[in-house]
Swiss-Prot record:
This is Adenylosuccinate synthetase. Keywords: Cytoplasm, GTP-binding, Ligase, Magnesium, Metal-binding, Nucleotide-binding, Purine biosynthesis. Pfam families: Adenylsucc_synt. Belongs to the adenylosuccinate synthetase family. The gene is purA. It is found in: Cytoplasm. NCBIfam families: PRK01117.1, purA. It catalyses: IMP + L-aspartate + GTP = N(6)-(1,2-dicarboxyethyl)-AMP + GDP + phosphate + 2 H(+). Coiled coil: none annotated. It is an enzyme of class 6 (ligase). One of its GO terms (molecular function) is GTP binding. CDD domains: AdSS (cd03108).
Length: 432
């Protein structure tokens, strides 16, 4: 069995994956982003200094780690170059540490324009996208009209292909959505400025990863968003446009499933969601406000305030099953400090009174769901910075045990603060 590890979110994103990946990359040779785009926001805090990454893998801060953007990612050249310059200004040699798949679809300004136009046209039925163009970029990939990084090697051919697709988008933008057209010449000029930088980092990622496996190098696969936002398994249509589950690791990176050994599911000690969509355990009271403010629940990408609620073990069980999760990492446990009681949703009561223990599929069936809670005592002691399980309050132990019982999966890692050091590792994911 391989000891390569997948790290992914089990909720609606924002679970704290970036910090966990950063910790575990101390053991890895490669960190791979395999899906999503710059709609992700992974926050790392190292010695009190905050770093927010959107496209670049969280392993970039490690000197001996190679960061990979694989072909399952839709790549915004503008966002990537901006991120590279910001990190290099801090002395991090990004271009020496990172490689990009030449099969990555390019995300350009016409995708953003279409995303924004569609959301505006939906009015009160807006999906709550980040407006970064992710959906339209994936649409182009599926429709086989996407421009890819590999197209940049032939600038003349790229310019012709770009003209065709800009005309296609502008027809819709102007005649259907009644908004301004995007400028073909500006898009072409902007991409030509950064073409040489992008192509200098290109590699055949599938071959690279297979060779790394043959050499015994350890790999970490970093997911973006969360399971409940998966295009197939999430709360459709309030989902992202990629597969966020473990199955996408192989299709999005080009490394076969036999070479994956352990799947670590990141779960926040409470639930959050950005944008519209079902959220059975959402809190609208002082407790919800407490979790939002204490947990600093504002999007790293959009700055939007996140909706907050109690931990939903029903949805978490679904994530465990879909991803064949080996172990859980419980994050932001310290945010619960000071609450008199803590609740976990263990089942749903449907509108007809029926009790179910797994999430529904159809959107209509989410309506009117009543969460059924298990209530536990809270704790007044601080858990911030605790690094040993024995030092946690007794009530925190009870909370962790109930999560394990409801999901039938062990909690292998506990995060007690934003810094690397604020972590309890009960089981090493690389030891399997």
């Amino acid at each position: 069995m391989s000891n390569n590890v997948v790290v992914l979110g089990t909720q609606w994103g924002d679970e704290g994956k970036g910090k966990v990946v950063d910790i575990l990359t101390e053991r890895a040779k490669y960190v791979i982003r395999y899906q999503g785009g710059h709609n992700a926001g992974h926050t790392l805090v190292i010695n009190g200094e905050k770093t927010i990454l959107h496209l670049i893998p969280s392993g970039i801060l490690r000197e001996n780690v190679k960061s990979i953007i694989a072909h399952g990612v839709v790549l915004s050249p503008e966002a990537l170059i901006k991120e590279i310059h910001e990190l290099e200004a801090r002395g991090i040699p990004v271009r020496q540490r990172m490689l990009i798949s030449e099969a990555c679809p390019l995300l350009l300004s016409y995708h953003v324009a279409m995303d924004i136009a569609r959301e505006k046209a939906r009015g009160t039925n807006a999906l709550g996208t980040t407006g970064r163009g992710i959906g339209p970029a994936y649409e182009d990939k599926v429709a086989r009209r996407a421009l890819r990084v590999s197209d940049l090697f032939n600038k003349e051919s790229f310019a012709i292909k770009l003209k065709d697709i800009v005309d296609y988008y502008n027809f819709q933008l102007v005649h259907y959505y009644k908004v301004e057209a995007v400028s073909y010449q500006k898009i072409l000029n902007d991409i030509m400025v950064v073409t040489d930088m992008l192509t200098s980092m290109v590699a055949d990622i599938s071959v690279l990863l297979y060779n790394a496996y043959q050499q015994g190098d350890i790999m970490m696969f970093e997911g973006a968003q969360g399971t409940l936002l998966d295009i197939d398994h999430g709360t459709y249509p309030y989902v992202t446009s990629s597969n966020t589950t473990a199955g996408c690791v192989t299709t999005g990176s080009g490394l076969g499933p036999h070479y994956i050994g352990y799947v670590l599911g990141i779960v926040k000690a409470y639930s959050t969601r950005v944008g519209a969509g079902p959220f059975p355990t959402e809190l609208f009271d002082d407790t919800g406000n407490f979790l939002c403010l204490k947990g600093h629940e504002f999007g790293a990408t959009t700055g939007r305030r996140r909706r907050t609620g109690w931990l939903d073990a029903v949805a978490l069980r679904r994530a465990v099953h879909i991803n064949s999760i080996s172990g859980l990492c419980l994050t932001k446990l310290d945010v619960l400090d000071g609450l008199k009681e803590i609740k976990i949703c263990s089942a749903y009561r449907m509108q007809d009174g029926c009790i179910i223990y797994t999430t529904p599929i159809a959107l209509e069936k989410w309506e009117g769901i009543e969460p059924i809670y298990e209530t536990l005592p809270g704790w007044n002691e601080t858990t911030v910075g605790i690094q040993a399980l024995a030092d946690l309050p007794r009530a925190a132990h009870q909370y962790i045990k109930l999560i394990e019982e409801l999901t039938r999966v062990p909690v292998d890692i506990i995060s007690t603060g934003p810094d690397r050091r604020d972590t309890i590792i009960l089981h090493d994911p690389f030891s399997d």
